[in-house]
């Protein structure tokens, strides 16, 4: 995702937020805490499985998928959390997908979107998300902290996404407990697992790290397993003929 493209997305989000009603806060969906689970299950590389119909880089991925059935297959095969794309314009997602999936699974769900405003956080929680995504590249450090604090006050966990060392340092300063490293270069749009490997020496004790993007095979997962608590996988699972088998290949035992 180029910086120019990210700017386009954020402009669209600003327009959406302007039209968005402030919802009444509903009760938080009950499930386990992701950070607690990662802390207590470090013997395996955990899989966060994503429901994603399309993306700007790949176009349509799987438009006809039964999203609830896909999510339940993820859960049945040991996914630690389900990531749900809710951006409509660029990813062909919908908030209703998050609502439907969250009502049919027991594990945590992540609202995968470009969050820039508190109204979006309330909507995510009301739709059943227990975790939201905040992208360092999309926010000033001050705004990031405001949204992070707001989400945690609402009982939500936050996956703070980074792309390089400078952003990783921002996440550390923030006190983020769960940190994502996205292997997609925001300038060139290319993906490279080496991004995750290169940032690993800067990881800190007491935090949980998730590698995102460009993870397709068991070999990819094995490369990341020494450094990461989990991986976020979308396209490989949405395209897989045998979803259950693909998840098992990605769940690397660390011994």
From Swiss-Prot:
The keyword Transcription is assigned to this record: no
Record carries keyword Lyase: yes
GO biological process: L-tryptophan biosynthetic process
One Pfam family from the record: IGPS
Pathway(s) the chain acts in: Amino-acid biosynthesis; L-tryptophan biosynthesis; L-tryptophan from chorismate: step 4/5
Sorted UniProt keywords: Amino-acid biosynthesis, Aromatic amino acid biosynthesis, Decarboxylase, Lyase, Tryptophan biosynthesis
EC supergroup of this enzyme: lyase
InterPro entries named among the record's database cross-references: Aldolase_TIM (IPR013785), Indole-3-glycerol_P_synth (IPR045186), Indole-3-glycerol_P_synth_dom (IPR013798), Indole-3-GlycerolPSynthase_CS (IPR001468), RibuloseP-bd_barrel (IPR011060)
Reaction catalyzed: 1-(2-carboxyphenylamino)-1-deoxy-D-ribulose 5-phosphate + H(+) = (1S,2R)-1-C-(indol-3-yl)glycerol 3-phosphate + CO2 + H2O
Entry EC number(s): 4.1.1.48
GO MF annotation terms: indole-3-glycerol-phosphate synthase activity; phosphoribosylanthranilate isomerase activity
NCBIfam families (alphabetical): PRK00278.1-3 (NF001371), PRK00278.2-4 (NF001377)
Protein family according to the UniProt entry: Belongs to the TrpC family.
Family annotation (PANTHER family): INDOLE-3-GLYCEROL-PHOSPHATE SYNTHASE, TRYPTOPHAN BIOSYNTHESIS PROTEIN
Protein name: Indole-3-glycerol phosphate synthase
Protein's organism: Streptococcus pneumoniae serotype 4 (strain ATCC BAA-334 / TIGR4)
Classification of source organism: Bacteria, Bacillati, Bacillota, Bacilli, Lactobacillales
Record gene name: trpC
């Amino acid at each position: 995702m180029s910086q120019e493209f990210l700017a386009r997305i954020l402009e669209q989000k600003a327009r959406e937020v302007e039209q968005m009603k402030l919802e009444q806060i509903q009760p938080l969906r009950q499930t386990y805490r992701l950070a607690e689970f990662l802390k207590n299950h470090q013997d395996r590389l955990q899989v966060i499985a994503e429901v994603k119909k399309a993306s700007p880089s790949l176009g349509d991925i799987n438009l006809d998928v039964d999203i609830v059935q896909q999510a339940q297959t993820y859960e049945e095969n040991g996914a630690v959390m389900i990531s749900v794309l809710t951006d409509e314009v660029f990813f062909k997602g919908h908030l209703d997908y998050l609502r439907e999936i969250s009502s049919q699974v027991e594990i945590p769900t992540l609202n995968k979107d470009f969050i820039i405003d508190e109204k979006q956080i309330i909507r995510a929680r009301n739709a059943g998300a227990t975790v939201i995504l905040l992208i360092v590249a999309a926010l000033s450090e001050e705004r990031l902290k405001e949204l992070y604090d707001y989400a945690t006050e609402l009982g939500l966990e936050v996956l703070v996404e980074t792309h390089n060392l400078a952003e990783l340092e921002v996440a550390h300063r923030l006190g983020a407990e769960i940190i994502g490293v996205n292997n997609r270069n925001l300038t060139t749009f290319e993906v490279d697992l080496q991004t995750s490997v290169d940032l690993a020496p800067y990881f800190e004790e007491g935090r949980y790290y998730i590698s995102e993007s460009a993870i397709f095979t068991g070999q990819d997962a094995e490369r990341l397993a020494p450094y990461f608590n989990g991986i976020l996988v979308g396209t490989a699972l949405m395209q897989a003929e045998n979803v259950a088998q693909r998840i098992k290949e990605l769940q690397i035992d660390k011994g």
